[in-house]
Amino acid sequence: MSLRSLLITTEAVGETTQTSDHQTSFSTRTYNEINDRPSLRVEKDGEKAYCFKNLDPVRYDTRMGEYPFDYGGQSTENNQLQFDLFTKDLMADTDIGLSDDVRDDLKRQIKEYYQQGYRAIFLIRPQNQEQQYIASYSSTNLNFTSQLSVGVNLSVLNKIQENKLHIYSTQPHIPSVGCEMITKIFRTDVDNENSLINYSVPVTVTISVTKATFEDTFVWNQNNDYPNMNYKDLIPAVTKNSIYHDVKRITKIHEYINSKKKKNGVGKIGGIQIAESKDGFWKILTKNYQIKLKFGIEGYGVMGGTFGNWLIDSGFKTVETNYEYQRNGKTINATTVASVKPSRKCGTRSPVFGQLQFSGEMMVLSHNDILTVFYTEREWALSNAIYAKNFATDFKRQFEVTAQSDELLVRTNVVPHTIKNTPGKALMEYSHGGFGQIDTSDYTGMALTFRFRCVSEDLPEGYYDKDKALTFANVGLTSFQDRQETNGTYWVYNTSTVGFGSCYPKKEFEYDINVTYTTLLPSDPEFTTGGTNYAQSVTAVLEESFINLQNQVNEMLTRMNISDLTSGVMSVFSVATSFPQILDGISDLLKAASSAFKKVKGKVGNVAKRLRGKRYVRLFDEDISIEETPRFLDSIRSSRRPSILSNMFNDDETFTALHTLASRTNSVASDVTYIQPIITTRIANSTPPVIAPASSVTYAKLKDISKIINAEIDPKSIMEFNQVSNTISILDSTKKLAQYAVDPDVIDGILNKMVGGHARSLFSLKVRKHLLDAVEKDAFVKYNYHDLMGKLLNDRELLDITNNLSSQKQFELAKEFRDLLINALA
């Protein structure tokens, strides 16, 4: 059974592809056509008439926003339940400093929104929600303070009529927190500069508008206590799209809030349904939850070199955390997935140190780097949502990530096996949040996202006190000299970086957070959008398999010196012509691996790189264009090589070479390995360089390439399309070899239009030229073009040359083969 037959048999798992029909596809129903259709249509059947509502899908524009939102005008379209107009942070006992222009603009905006049925919300959030505080207003003829309060408080201005303020508030007494802002903005009998507002603790003041309506908590007639108070009437218009809250509903919410009050008066909201609106099949739901966010940050390091004393790879893992906690007397099963994207390194990578000494660099979570945490629960509204928006949270806390130097995960093979290091410290702060897709061991679907930014200072080398010096990370050395200067400072090395190093074990963090968001859900609970119904654990198992495979490849690559790799390549080619025939039971395994790989391809960043471009498939009754990067498998399926490429390794031999070397974690032996499904699937989806005569490339694509490289292409040329380095190389009939860097999508487009006439190669044209030059320095001079191609594209003759290569040529050969292997398996 050949490799081509095996892979073609096992590739088509649950889909139909069309590789020859490469024309542009158009949908028979456009968005404009749907918009032009009437909302109701009448059809007659004899004497009977039937009325149908237009059930074509409605397009919803969603966004992921930061909270609080910036001050400024917002869209007036009715596609948002609530959004902010103004926000400001205030220190304790400091006037809000609202200028006349800002106050007038706010008043104008609020008046316009009231004409559309909105209400204004005045929300006060103290920085320390366990600290008691009061709000106060003072002017020439009116002074008042709220009662002592704790936590977040809000007041909704339902309307102003006949100098009476109709207010819904989270506080039952008059005046409530928020009334001071209402009075400052809407009073007409006093100048803005003569009215002052302050709070006894640091707070954030937010003014927003909402479509929801609330029953009045109280009606405040200030003239009863303070005569001559003047307000202009402000009455919201009644619209059919308003979301109504009756007294019973608000009372129920208040009873729930009061039941959660602690003895010290701190309000803990576990989960409140703020608003709900139904329209046909769908409903819009706004909810508030108190969640426990628990996540981990875990690093890794890989040692390599001849004796395993060099740190050749490091970084942070994607950490999945499954945990339980109590909310409202119920056990909540939650999952978080945390990932760190470091951008800087510390340490020194210097091969001149020798194989017996430590050398290497460690990735560092440093200034402006991002930590992203995805959160989901086993049962909640978001899991069955079509989309979500208006994410908000009260989390403002900073936290520090650090470790002990003796926790370093990597060791050398030289006594005493330890490596000097300083873990450093990273100060993290909540940046913004929103929504995203998550793929965990037991859930696939929508999740909340929390993004934390490292706010540690970006400091250069120099003299610092010890506390500051300990915030620098380093490996191979401590971050600073042991000797203390006379002024009490220490010299920090230039190989150090402020932040937290990656080669340390898992550190866990846990915080209580309030979140609010709006979702679109099916109004009938019998309808489902999937949620956990399609959450397959196979994706997690497959990811773990890929990680294990990557670790094996890293270990194999790092433990091979140049001669090992070169001899390993030679050993591989010695068995390349004998493709492993041990295929008992492999078809089912390969089919499962191929199917699972498709499910996660492009979805999880560290499992498989997202493939580019389009691919043409038939889905139901429509042609869908999903062009992707052409793979090794595509070449196998359409392999019809011209005679000029006949002496290159065929597909079976090339595949066997990659598979055999990838299957070993030490120096390559001469025996044949059993075929491994995961490795087979990855190599089948890899992209080794493509070598083809110019005649195999369509005329239109040759013209496109000519424009890119600004030169005409000789029709007798041999061309190489390298998807590893994103380059095109051309060897023309004058025996001139030129290489051009191009956009990867250009290569994809060329290969997608190429039907056969090419071969996947283990080596580039550049390395082939170097191999030939090693034994025949004047080969490009003395041979004519036809004979030169015969030697340059003869894999077996080139491999015989490798035993006579210089150290530099061996290094180039090994480096290219290593890059090719990483491309196939990483």
Swiss-Prot record:
This protein's UniProt keywords: Capsid protein, Hemagglutinin, Host cell membrane, Host endoplasmic reticulum, Host membrane, Host-virus interaction, Membrane, Outer capsid protein, Viral attachment to host cell, Viral penetration into host cytoplasm, Viral penetration via permeabilization of host membrane, Virion, Virus entry into host cell
Record site feature (Probable cleavage), residues: 249-250, 262-263
Pfam families from the UniProt entry: Rota_VP4_MID
One GO cellular component, as annotated: host cell plasma membrane
SUPFAM superfamilies: VP4 membrane interaction domain
Protein's GO biological process: permeabilization of host organelle membrane involved in viral entry into host cell; virion attachment to host cell
Family annotation (InterPro entries): Rota_A_VP4, Rota_VP4_MID, Rota_VP4_MID_sf
Natural source organism: Rotavirus X (isolate RVX/Human/Bangladesh/NADRV-B219/2002/GXP[X]) (RV ADRV-N)
Similarity comment: Belongs to the rotavirus VP4 family.
Protein name, per record: Outer capsid protein VP4
Keyword Membrane: yes
Top-level taxon: Viruses
